[in-house]
Amino acid sequence: MSEFSKTPLLDTIRTPADLRKLRIDQVRQVADELRQETIEAVSVTGGHFGAGLGVVELTTAIHYVFDTPRDRLIWDVGHQAYPHKILTGRRDRIRTLRTGGGLSGFTKRTESDYDPFGAAHSSTSISAGLGMAVARDLAGGKNNVIAVIGDGSISAGMAYEAMNNAGAMNSRLIVILNDNNMSIAPPVGAMSAYLSRLYSGKTYRTLREAGKQIGKHLPKLIADRAARAEEYSRGFMMGGGTLFEELGFYYVGPVDGHNLDHLLPILQNVRDADTGPFLIHVVTQKGKGYGPAEAASDKYHAVVKFDIATGAQAKAKSNAPSYQNVFGQSLVKEAQKDDKIVGITAAMPSGTGIDIFEKAFPTRTFDVGIAEQHAVTFAAGLAAEGYKPFCAIYSTFLQRGYDQVVHDVAIQSLPVRFAIDRAGLVGADGATHAGSFDNAFLGCLPNMVIMAASDEAELVHMVATQVAINDRPSAVRYPRGEGRGVEMPEVGIALEIGKGRIVREGNKIALLSFGTRLAECEKAADELATLGLSTTIADARFMKPLDVELVLKLARDHEILLTIEEGSIGGFGSHVMQTLAEHGMLDGEVRMRSLVLPDEFMDHDTPTAMYARAGLDAKGIVKKVFEALGKDAKTDTVKLA
């Protein structure tokens, strides 16, 4: 341990067992050093920032009080897990966060025994924790199970389903509500802290359980009134919790999440309890301890590399507008002409571009929170009344509302317009956020129009196309990040439904692209031309309805037909192959190949590296063409533009 170290106590901690050897006064210093280490690490890597700073004391207290990993600690979403990773043997790799071969930006079971359950999507922690608590009870175990969930995540329906189940089972589960928005918390003061400590203690719990037993022998009316009076008296003194009590939880809080003198004894009391479930309401501040993040928590929720002294984030030069901005701006232009257009997002206004629409039309914009199921059916209700809802959701989160897409939208042919953001691979957020499956899970549904934009100009036209579709649902998918820098149209023009376009004419090889891999097809075609292989490039535009005429022409007129998409097996390529099979085109000499994402969950890296590994870049396309020709492409020597 260097005498010049800025983190001398943290330097002694390899695992939480080392932390538990320290005195309480030393734990406070560890928390201060942990916050500094988190700031320095994220300034180098970028990533989710504000939430982690807000739970430094809570993270330290949990690992100090509980016997992790024997006691199971589950973090909802995982945005706040960086301090947890530092304390659990991963500090030496913390500056590899979200890079190829480095640490995940979320909790991950294969990464550490201290991550008993993986996370990235919200509101799963209580359900998983309850499952682990029941498994413990069935096995006769005594360990604790702790689920930490934020005030945003707990608003989702799944969290309430889990709490309702846990309360009914009287499970010995500990839920810690990390309230960093002050959305349901009253002011936190000394009296509140004292009462929380008192009510979490054994004496009060014993008296309360005794009261319950006595109540069983009283007339029901008297027993019910006594229980209700006890609940409301604590609700009045504690400033809340009645809802959680109604769900069967023993509520403790609110507690100052940055005060270890308050946190430690409460966690110790709950740890030693033999009843449950508990909900500890902890109030924290996003970005705590770093001035710029405290002042602008929204801007420092997730960051790129930044200068610690100033808080200034590194900004790459932009050569083209982002797809998100193009979508938002296009929707605004359409809505200026049509007052039936409304925008819907599930807690992702800036990520989807709906924030641009909201600035122009605040009364026609609806952020429903972390509630994708509700968002879809809410949109269906609007569509049923003649409005034109644009439901902007990340591909990975649309998975959470799939039954609603089928049951409430598609079966009824309601014209909900889905703007599917983050289609394809997303890079640093890895498998949990990849938009890999929407081609497959939407493509199998009747009554759907499915489009993919090959560039930002095409997205403008596809938004206009969706506005004009009033007899069935539609979807347009597009990736994260910037477009290609193509010339932008002044206005969007509705496309002919189910018709693709020829981008370049050839006679030997046909590349049929669905989505933004079109740019890589053009590079591959240039290379193939230098090798004497004349190549046609087609932009499918539509996966459903498929341009059957175009598919058959490409198959008849070329020796090789290759489909390319940013999606899993079962998507666009499968639809093309089904069409060829139905027309007897696979019985003859047509050689058709399909380039899709590999049948695996791909770990995080840069999108460029991930697509290269998937074989979905120009080099991979050339290689696949030569494989279909039965020749050696000698890809090591292929020089791509």
UniProtKB/Swiss-Prot annotation:
Q: What does this protein do?
A: Catalyzes the acyloin condensation reaction between C atoms 2 and 3 of pyruvate and glyceraldehyde 3-phosphate to yield 1-deoxy-D-xylulose-5-phosphate (DXP).
Residue positions annotated to bind thiamine diphosphate are 79, 120-122, 152-153, 180, 290, 372
List, alphabetically, the CDD domains matched.
Answer: TPP_DXS, TPP_PYR_DXS_TK_like
Q: Which top class of enzyme applies to this chain?
A: transferase
Q: Which PROSITE patterns match?
A: TRANSKETOLASE_1, TRANSKETOLASE_2
Q: In which pathway does it act?
A: Metabolic intermediate biosynthesis; 1-deoxy-D-xylulose 5-phosphate biosynthesis; 1-deoxy-D-xylulose 5-phosphate from D-glyceraldehyde 3-phosphate and pyruvate: step 1/1
- Identify the keywords attached in UniProt to this record, alphabetized: Isoprene biosynthesis, Magnesium, Metal-binding, Thiamine biosynthesis, Thiamine pyrophosphate, Transferase
Q: Which domain of life is it from?
A: Bacteria
Name this protein carries in UniProt: 1-deoxy-D-xylulose-5-phosphate synthase
Q: Which SMART domains match?
A: Transket_pyr
Q: How is the cofactor bound?
A: Binds 1 Mg(2+) ion per subunit. Binds 1 thiamine pyrophosphate per subunit.
The cofactors required by this protein are: Mg(2+); thiamine diphosphate
Which GO molecular function, any one, fits this protein according to its record? magnesium ion binding
The UniProt annotation places Mg(2+) binding at 151, 180
